[in-house]
Amino acid sequence: MSESAAQEIPMSRRQLLSFVTGGAIAATTAATLYPVVLYFLPPSTAGGGEGVAAKDKEGKDISVSKLLAAATPGEPVLTLGLDVNGGDATYIVINDQKEIANFGINAVCTHLGCVVPWDNGAKQFKCPCHGSVYNADGGLERGPAPQPLALVKATVSDDKVLIAPWTEQDFRCTDLWCNKDPYWVK
């Protein structure tokens, strides 16, 4: 040990408390900012560029085998998925053969952004905010919504449902809306 190191003055109590307080503030700030930063980052994709894995209400990946075992044919299942049209609530469509359809439906109303629940009795999506009605494919049946619910592409890979942007033509056509170009693709 050199003689200059032995002559250094040890840290004072005030310096130690300042150091500990600064560390506590830095740790608290980092813990607070971590979820904020994650919010602005794009969601991780499952399986390369194939899409985002659909999640349940707890944020866990949905197992296709468990989903189909519990699903009712013709009744869509609400999941968390791709942020389309300002919201990531997405319906996975279960067809009559009890298979996952190749498309899903974004659950955000095109009028004012309310999440649209499925009415199983009427076999329609009905917006609770202002009464817009959408058919089982998300096609617009009654306004004030100006457009149908946005579509997403749904594929199955490794027992997961992958949701990706729908870029193909819109296959739905109703009396209120019949535009083949997907309005949600920018």
UniProtKB/Swiss-Prot annotation:
Database matches in Pfam families: Rieske, TM_PetC
Residues spanning the membrane: 16-38
Subunit structure and binding partners: The 4 large subunits of the cytochrome b6-f complex are cytochrome b6, subunit IV (17 kDa polypeptide, PetD), cytochrome f and the Rieske protein, while the 4 small subunits are PetG, PetL, PetM and PetN. The complex functions as a dimer.
Substrates-to-products reaction catalysed: 2 oxidized [plastocyanin] + a plastoquinol + 2 H(+)(in) = 2 reduced [plastocyanin] + a plastoquinone + 4 H(+)(out)
Protein source organism: Gloeobacter violaceus (strain ATCC 29082 / PCC 7421)
Molecular-function GO term, any one: oxidoreductase activity
Single GO BP term: photosynthesis
Protein name per its UniProtKB record: Cytochrome b6-f complex iron-sulfur subunit
Domain Rieske: 74-163
Function: Component of the cytochrome b6-f complex, which mediates electron transfer between photosystem II (PSII) and photosystem I (PSI), cyclic electron flow around PSI, and state transitions.
Membrane topology per record: Single-pass membrane protein
GO cellular component: plasma membrane
Binding sites annotated in the UniProt record for [2Fe-2S] cluster: 109, 111, 127, 130
Membership in a protein family: Belongs to the Rieske iron-sulfur protein family.
